[in-house]
């Protein structure tokens, strides 16, 4: 996976304490946007109620049979073989160390983890959580991808999967992060 390195918006560094405070305040919105992007029909007030009450948990086992990613135009991109994912993830972590900018590291992780499908399920959710953790640890806001921008997000994802080019997705993510950092 590659992307064009060009001038992108400056993301304001808030400091870790302020970033965590904002995360706490924005959590219902972050959760609702993530769920809505995947077709969940909960309303924002319902998400707030569930988070406040702690009414969520995951149980059980998960098994998969391979699979792939369905594109907006109906195309299909098969997953990479499972036995190659561990090495690919290790290679990704090494390559991220070569990036000086923690924002670029976090967003590149999101793009690569989403493209490689490292996780059995919830790849975009998991990649967004890891990217947000990296951002917060360096004093930036968490990554929020607004549901209102779903079409733009899906088009950038299609480009990522079809051409193995993360340029459009990196630009989109930088824009989302700049928006959520204000």
Which residue ranges define each predicted feature?
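FIC/Doc superfamily catalytic core
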Residues: 1-182
């Amino acid at each position: 996976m590659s992307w064009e390195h060009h001038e992108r918006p400056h993301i304001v560094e808030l400091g870790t304490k302020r970033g965590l405070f904002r995360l706490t305040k924005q959590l219902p919105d972050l959760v609702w946007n993530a769920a809505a992007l995947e077709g969940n029909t909960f309303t924002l007030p319902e998400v707030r109620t569930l988070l406040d009450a702690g009414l969520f948990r995951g149980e059980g086992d998960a098994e998969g049979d391979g699979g792939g990613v369905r594109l907006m135009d109906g195309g299909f991109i098969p997953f990479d073989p499972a036995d190659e994912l561990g090495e690919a993830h290790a290679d990704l972590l090494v390559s991220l160390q070569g990036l000086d900018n923690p924002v670029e590291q976090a967003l590149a992780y999101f793009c690569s983890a989403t493209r490689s499908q490292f996780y059995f399920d919830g790849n975009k959710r998991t990649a967004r959580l890891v990217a947000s953790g990296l951002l917060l640890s360096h004093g930036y806001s968490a990554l929020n991808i607004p549901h209102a921008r779903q079409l733009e997000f899906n088009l950038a994802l299609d480009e990522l999967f079809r051409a193995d080019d993360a340029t459009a997705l990196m630009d989109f993510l930088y824009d989302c992060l700049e928006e959520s950092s204000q």
